[in-house]
Amino acid sequence: MEQKYEEDIQKLQQEIEMLEAEQEETLRSIFVQHGDRLQQGVKSACEERGGGGAQQHAVSKLITEVRELEKDLRRQTEINGITLNECFVKTLHKSERKLVQQLRLAGHCGLLLFQVEFAVTEIQEDNVLHRRVTELNIVVDGVEFKDFSAFVSRVEDTKDLLLFFRTLRTFSERCEDRRQTFQHFQEKYPDVVNLPEGCRSEIMIIRSPQLPGISMTLFWKIHVSKEGVVKPLLDLLLKMPDQALELDTKKVMEKGSDYFQSLLQLLGVEASIEGLIRAVCS
């Protein structure tokens, strides 16, 4: 009977520790999401109550801690380009040797919105701490996701969370490069450049106002390898009426894509697109 009581007491102690850990994690999450409002609320309460020296010191210390948390978050955002809007942590199991936590992170990297849910298991063996991700689910929202979906699926299978965040920033930067380039040429040549799916898509159509039926379609995909290597892939499709094709004795239309690839290597992306547009306008 005594042994049973000891076991019950031990279980209660473990539950208390888990609840305390959850409380601490909840407060940390609240600071992440509502730091500004908390800081203002604490200031208002202090001003209304007047408070003694000890109370004011405690409030001042709390405000300082909130500010430090905010500075750390801003610093991390500047370093990795990722902004977190939500951070939730829940302890599922806690003992002397093992800790299991469920986490949910939501935010954005550039124009890409993401939500990541994962479980982390920590096991203490002698003086060595083993930590691994045991579950992983990733949701990325944006028109660019079709270029990213295969990579995300593989990351979910391998549970390589660090690879996902490293690749997310590079992928987001390449998407932004494409968006800015497309938008630039559409604004510069509104009568020639058409973006049927918007400036965040992978397609640009170049049409000549003087030569109906002749067009160039630029495909700008962003490929992500299974190792997380991000590489832009550009291709060109030329189109003209059948009658004009019969006069194309030099096979310009047939070899147009190869010519464009050579142009990319020599001049780069923006100068190559500029050359295509000027050729159509001339």
UniProtKB/Swiss-Prot annotation:
Its localization reads: Nucleus; Chromosome, Centromere
List the GO terms this entry assigns under cellular component, sorted alphabetically: chromosome, centromeric region; nucleus
Q: Which domain of life is it from?
A: Eukaryota
The record's section on InterPro entries has: CENP-P
Q: Major location, coarse class?
A: nucleus
UniProt keyword terms in alphabetical order: Centromere, Chromosome, Coiled coil, Nucleus
Concerning Pfam families, the annotation shows: CENP-P (PF13096)
What sections of the sequence does the record tag as coiled-coil?
Answer: 1-80
Gene Ontology BP term (one): CENP-A containing chromatin assembly
What's the family? Answer: Belongs to the CENP-P/CTF19 family.
Q: What does this protein do?
A: Probable component of a centromeric complex involved in assembly of kinetochore proteins, mitotic progression and chromosome segregation.
Q: What is this protein called?
A: Centromere protein P
Recorded source organism is Danio rerio (Zebrafish)
Phylogenetic classification of the source organism: Eukaryota, Metazoa, Chordata, Craniata, Vertebrata
